[in-house]
Amino acid sequence: LAAALARRLAQLADDPEGTLFFGRIDLDGTGHEPAEVFHIGRRHVSDPEGDPLVVDWRAPVSTPFYRATRTEPMGVAVRRRYGFQRGALTGFEDESLTAPGPGAESSAILEAEIERPRTGPMRDIVATIQPEQDVIVRSGIDRTVVVQGAPGTGKTAVGLHRAAYLLYSHRERVSRAGMTVVGPNASFLRYIRDVLPALGEVDATQTTVEQIVPAHGRQRGPDPAGPGREAGVDRYYGGRVEATGFRVAD
């Protein structure tokens, strides 16, 4: 019990730049039934009676926030995005998914968040995940996923959010096997180290290839198989990438 409480406290550690929620979806009410409203945030928050005040972004009910469109509203009538600056609410935008006529071309709040200068350690992108990225993040645990893209297209961020999703949706299975994030070097790990904790996940270990492969087990020099091995690897993983059908948009 003590270990569980300590873990929960670590998950709820306050982030001065963080916010309790960043979005809301109003479901399309039917008949005389009132429409359900869900606030979407980084972590689940309940009232004393156990009713949800904020729904975790990884919960199934949150999926329409990222994927609903005018043509496929997924039962959502209105999607709301909140704007924050240093933890203070600065505004919000409502997007109707059921009103006639063309929808809004873009969200000023969404664009401002995406274009916010990236300084210091990597931040999570949970408020700005795009539909094609969400498909990757929520893909099944039994599927191998390879994310390709040019520099700056969000490959690392999508991979970390997928890790957070798997820890949430398959916690028991992942906890038994453990989860490790392997980076190219220590500087890279320092750059990404705050992303998973910001999403409430503190159990994943982070390491480098050099830390998990003993020095005496590494050999330097040309590959005796030469270009043939590289071509074979490219064909194998190229096929796996095509099989997944996932890409991060440029």
Question: What spans do the regions from the language model cover?
Answer:
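Extended, charged low-complexity regulatory segments
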Residues: 1-135
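Alpha-helical nucleic-acid-binding subdomain
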Residues: 167-250
